[in-house]
Amino acid sequence: MRFILLIILLFFNLISYSQSLSESDIKILAQRINKELQGMDFGNGIAVKGCYAIGRTLVYQYLVSEDWVAPENIKTDLIENLNKSGYAETYFNNDISVEYQYFFENRLREKISIKSYELTNLNFNLGEYISIVGHPKAKGVNLKLKPPMGWQIEEGDRPNIVQKFLFKNNNYMIIVKDNVMFFSRNEIRELLSDEEYVNQFLSDASSFLSNPQILNHRIVSVDKYPSLEFTLKGEMERVGIKMTIKQKCWMIFFEDKIIYLQCGGLDNNEFTALEKLYDLITNSVIFPEQYDY
């Protein structure tokens, strides 16, 4: 199976030179693969029937012998081979799913579907707790959380950014700002129930972007403190380069402070996958002082 996969992957050079493949690109790629490999016999009871594309899914079809039996861990093996070859990352970044179909005498014997998000090698493990207590930018806030393993931990380079975790084009930042006054948790819950206030805040929060879109928002609790969770996307420019970015943010009202847990990255499949990690980090947040009794 590994040999078959590596042979097929030789025809994927087109992907390496494209930042983001459209459905039309994927269709053309499938036609190329089909033309090159159709009818190829691998000599082990498996021959190539063809390849085609459905939307963002590449479908590989094979003819197998009557006594062919799919390996017990065939899906795991296929994903492992895609990762080892380096093409899993390309599929993942371009949001390309793959499906493998095996036929005997035009009857489907086995079908394995692999979604693009299953092809990420991202690490979703968290490290040991770190605390911002005593940090000059923390403004007296006592907060601790678990950073993502394998990410670079740096000090914030702007006045209110306490710390940031970095991985390629992605970041998770801890930002602390002064609020206008002290608010109790009940007062904040009442404030966040005001739809006009929330909409105005979201409009202000996305104003630094061109063509901003608020993708979703909801009221949640972060370690018992009422918070506004929202995701937005839009366009921005840096040193002449235009890009579409996404941000996921938790705005936590903590007494007389506002804490922003802000995650950002390019609008791609990687950001979508990392949202799970961002949720895990935020769910690890603890405000220790509320338990000192």
Locations of regions flagged by a protein language model:
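Short, non-transmembrane amphipathic alpha-helical segments
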Residues: 69-92
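Short, exposed beta-strand-loop hairpins at the edges of beta-sheets
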Residues: 89-92, 99-114, 239, 252, ...
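Sec-dependent N-terminal signal peptides
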Residues: 3-18
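N-terminal targeting sequences that direct proteins away from the cytosol to non-cytosolic compartments
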Residues: 49-50, 120-170, 219, 241-243, ...
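Polar/charged, Gly/Pro-rich intrinsically disordered segments
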Residues: 20-66, 92-133, 217
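Start-of-domain marker
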Residues: 24-48, 70-74, 136, 142-146, ...
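A short acidic-to-branched-hydrophobic micro-motif
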Residues: 59-71, 163-196
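Signature of long, low-cysteine stretches enriched in small and polar/charged residues
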Residues: 124, 199-252
